Amino acid sequence: MGLSNVQLWTILLWALAWVQSTRSACPSCGAPTLTPQGERALVLELAKQQILEGLHLTSRPRITRPLPQAALTRALRRLQPRSMVPGNREKVISFATSIDKSTSTYRSVLTFQLSPLWSHHLYHARLWLHVPPSFPATLYLRIFGCGTTRCRGSRTFLAEHQTTSSGWHALTLPSSGLRSEESGVTKLQLEFRPLDLNSTTARLPRLLLDTAGQQRPFLELKIRANEPGAGRARRRTPTCESETPLCCRRDHYVDFQELGWRDWILQPEGYQLNYCSGQCPPHLAGSPGIAASFHSAVFSLLKANNPWPAGSSCCVPTARRPLSLLYLDHNGNVVKTDVPDMVVEACGCS
């Protein structure tokens, strides 16, 4: 679910007020902290605007007469460039092997057996859960990553979701929160409660999830092999971790299905909407950088509304690459285009 214009501008104005109160020398050096779901909603809204701007569209095409499947397949075969066929990319489906319900009546721990991905980069993760018809129509779900064997110690909030119907539901998880133990075991904790005022937890069935039947929870993971030299690139521009204060690249994978745009964007399935953030100490100032583009629209807006000291060093993109898209235009034509400078690959201090 995306943000409305009012919600988006509310977040931007709140961020502006935060920066003005702190008088930071650079808008990308320390942004106000958003909740994971708030940051995700903002990223999805920015992705919509970035795609529309890159395609010079004011609104998404409305597909009233879908192309016949045979004609669409033939067009895709002719137009799809080799570069759009992801090389060394894999999709992994991992089913929960056990569910521990001993921690609480309405709290469950899901265990997944994942092989350590030392030679691969995890760039997209979704948790699929099945809500049975015996539960209220509206449930509030929260997912946590566990830091200990039975989730009794520290845990990290990953996602929240509100159901409005029974059946399958997909929760997008931050890939950084799915760190497995050396044994490959990953544990996620699920909490749930009803949002219907006429429902009470006392009347809720205890078993929300089941690993024995046809509705087993599962993780959908998208990974790609690390390219030669990727380690050196990561040392120059590390991917942002929660404890990283310095200039780094913050990675977000946007699935067009999550945007509700798979009816008109044919290829690829999604793309990396990355941006740069972090501090630039004096000894890092002057590293090669290029002007930020729409990907850092938040920072650009803040900077335009606040006079920053001359000579201040900011964390900005230093390398970007185009994004190849196959899409249906307003007339139902299949169009192939390369949108320049869409994906940030490296960051540095200006």
UniProtKB/Swiss-Prot annotation:
Protein's UniProt keywords contain Disulfide bond: yes
Residues carrying a glycan: N198
Signal peptide start and end residues: 1-21
Domain of life: Eukaryota
Propeptide residue span(s): 22-236
InterPro entries, sorted: Cystine-knot_cytokine (IPR029034), Inhibin_betaC (IPR001318), TGF-b_C (IPR001839), TGF-beta-rel (IPR015615), TGFb_CS (IPR017948)
A molecular-function term among this protein's GO annotations: growth factor activity
Swiss-Prot/TrEMBL keywords: Cleavage on pair of basic residues, Disulfide bond, Glycoprotein, Growth factor, Hormone, Secreted, Signal
Keyword Disulfide bond: yes
GO cellular component, one term: extracellular space
Cellular localisation: Secreted
Gene Ontology process terms (BP): negative regulation of adipose tissue development
Membrane-crossing residue ranges in chain numbering: none
Disulfide bonds: C240-C248, C247-C315, C276-C347, C280-C349
Pfam families cross-referenced by the UniProt entry: TGF_beta (PF00019)
Family under the similarity heading: Belongs to the TGF-beta family.
PANTHER family according to UniProt: INHIBIN BETA E CHAIN, TGF-BETA FAMILY
Binding partners and assembly: Homodimeric or heterodimeric through association with alpha and beta subunits, linked by one or more disulfide bonds. Inhibins are heterodimers of one alpha and one beta subunit. Activins are homo- or heterodimers of beta subunits only.
Protein task: Inhibins and activins inhibit and activate, respectively, the secretion of follitropin by the pituitary gland. Inhibins/activins are involved in regulating a number of diverse functions such as hypothalamic and pituitary hormone secretion, gonadal hormone secretion, germ cell development and maturation, erythroid differentiation, insulin secretion, nerve cell survival, embryonic axial development or bone growth, depending on their subunit composition. Inhibins appear to oppose the functions of activins. Activin E is a homodimer of INHBE secreted by the liver that plays a crucial role in regulating metabolic homeostasis particularly in lipid metabolism and energy homeostasis. Plays a central role in the regulation of adipose tissue lipolysis by preventing the influx of fatty acids from adipose tissue into the liver. Mechanistically, signals via ACVR1C to activate SMAD2/3 signaling, suppressing PPARG target genes in adipose tissue, thereby reducing liver lipid content and improving glycemic control. Induces beige adipocyte formation and thermogenesis in response to cold exposure.
Name recorded for this polypeptide: Inhibin beta E chain
Taxonomic lineage of the native organism: Eukaryota, Metazoa, Chordata, Craniata, Vertebrata
Gene designation: Inhbe
